[in-house]
Amino acid sequence: MTAATLYLVDTDVLIDAFRKIEGAGPYLNSLGEWSYSTATAMELFFGARSKKEIHAIEKSLSSYRRVRFSHEIGELALDIVKKYAKPDGTGELDAVIAATAIEEGMTLASRNKKHFRNIEGLKFEVPEY
């Protein structure tokens, strides 16, 4: 029996689901139990346009595990920024998200190929919806 794949879902996929982009909701449901990072929560709340949207995001995320920052995630994110920020345009929060997936042994689900595709050690899946 093989272990189920553990997924860390990136901000773009969650935004697609919140906006009811065709296929995004079923894709998330197909993952089973998935998690999101504190960096993803920060991006979502930063992009909220009202308190109503903040409450909707909180409610939507409440059933899922949030992976919090750790010292190891911070150190790995720093290494990722130093190595990939210029050639691939990987930003600070994307580096934290990638580091979270690597440290937790998870597969990152994201449509953002440019920022994540070359990061060494990152298991990466591009949703097809």
Predicted regions and their residues:
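A generic structural signal for short hydrophobic patches within well-formed alpha-helices
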Residues: L14, A41-L44, G74, F116
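Short beta-strand->loop
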Residues: G121-Y129
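Conserved glycosyltransferase catalytic-site signature
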Residues: T11, T38, L93-A95
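Residues at the C-termini of beta-strands that transition into short coil/loop
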Residues: T38-T40, S70, N112, E128
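Active-site neighborhoods of divalent-metal-dependent phosphate/nucleic-acid chemistry enzymes
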Residues: T2-T5, R66-K114
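Short, well-structured N-terminal submotif of metal-dependent ribonuclease cores
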Residues: M1-Y36, F45-K59
